[in-house]
């Protein structure tokens, strides 16, 4: 890890087994794909092993700095991105050409090609995004988290 987390956030135990190997997949289904009865397109496949911070570190950092975390509070990971193009964690990263570390505003972007001939750099009204998550390893059973999906609706008109 560079830079190394502060001492109170570092331990051999956390380095070896602190992270959860949660696999995430994100799919896109446009209205046109749905009308043509096509399968959703896999956009990205990522892993929580690529996160800089483990959830134990995030929880410790928040609570040790005065954040009043309580039972039932939601704690999010942020974007889950990997080093390869097919493991980038958001549409902005997926469509960027070249080196993500040095991308500048206005950098060249290549749209995602869909089986209908449609292209996307951003989500459009009517698009459905589908998230799937699961944990698995060779010595444990696969644990699935089901799916989470939502459709982008047009903005409400003032009136």
Model-flagged regions — what are they?
Residues 1-159:
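Catalytic-pocket segment enriched in acidic/His residues
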């Amino acid at each position: 890890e560079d830079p190394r987390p502060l001492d109170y956030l570092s331990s051999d135990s956390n380095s070896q087994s602190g992270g959860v190997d949660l696999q995430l997949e994100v799919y896109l289904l446009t209205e046109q794909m749905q009308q043509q009865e096509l399968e959703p397109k896999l956009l990205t496949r990522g892993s929580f092993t690529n996160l800089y911070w483990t959830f134990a570190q995030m929880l410790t950092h928040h609570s040790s700095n005065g954040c009043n975390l309580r039972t039932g509070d939601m704690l999010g990971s942020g974007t889950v991105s990997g080093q390869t193009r097919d493991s980038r964690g958001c549409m902005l990263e997926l469509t960027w050409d070249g080196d993500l570390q040095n991308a500048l505003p206005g950098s060249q972007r290549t749209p995602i090609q869909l089986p209908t001939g449609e292209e996307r750099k951003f989500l459009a009204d009517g698009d459905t995004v589908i998230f799937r998550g699961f944990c698995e390893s060779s010595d444990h059973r696969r644990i699935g988290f089901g799916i989470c999906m939502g459709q982008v609706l047009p903005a409400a008109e003032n009136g």
